[in-house]
Amino acid sequence: VGTQQGRLFRISGLSDVYTQEDADSKLTVDLILTTGAGGITGIAVDANDNSRLAISCGGYGSADRVRFTENALAATPVFNNVHGDLVEMPIYSIEINLNDPNMVVIGTEFGIWATSDITATSVTWSDENDDNSYIPIYAMKQQHLPRSEASNSGVVYVGSFGRGFWESTDELFVGTPEFANTPSTEKFISDFKVFPNPIQT
């Protein structure tokens, strides 16, 4: 869990918690990082190896907004500053690529950026903005389910400031088509029910 004060906590034992009493006795909370670089805005865990973790931080004026560790499960993980050649800008969201764990994609004040090797001595970031221009990217999530469980396995979804939601397709971010304002010409289903219905109690 990341905080606005730049602290990162690791919570262990959640799989054994079923009641408040369990939480009091079975949870372990460890402070594993204090960034000093602004609030933690994003946390990405490698879907293939949960000892690999990357975080993003907000705020201007500092070149330490992206951190990475390969020993997140250790008692005292070592986080490296992987801000690299990025401009000193806020980083709002972050993902470790499911299919290439050395690739990290970030959402920034100025759009989408990526590195092909987060473990490099000097990390180089590339501009991935293409059609969605240099707009703040506040949310980013990759579908981690395998193709046998999800047809969109590996697709990255991003939420922008003012330009809507986008999805990745062959490394190019394209907009998801919007619904037209015209009524559907398909047959109306009058007895269609959705459960549970949050409107009815």
Region roles according to the model:
Residues 44-67, 83-120:
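Loop/turn-rich, solvent-exposed surfaces of beta-rich toroidal or solenoidal domains
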Residues 37-38, 81-95, 123-147:
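Conserved blade-ending motifs and adjacent loop-strand segments that build the rim/top face
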Residues 5, 14, 59-60, 72, ...:
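Residue-level signature of beta-propeller blades and closely related beta-rich strand-turn architectures
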Residues 45, 181-201:
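Surface-exposed, proline-anchored Ser/Thr-rich loop/turn motifs
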Residues 135-175:
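Blade-level signature of beta-propeller repeat domains, shared across WD40, Kelch, NHL, RCC1
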Residues 12-20, 70-75, 116-121, 169-175:
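Short loop/turn segments immediately following beta-strands, especially the blade-tip
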Residues 7-10, 64-68, 111-114, 155, ...:
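A short loop-to-beta-strand structural motif that recurs across blades of beta-propeller domains
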Residues 19-33, 78-84, 124-130:
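Beta-propeller fold detector
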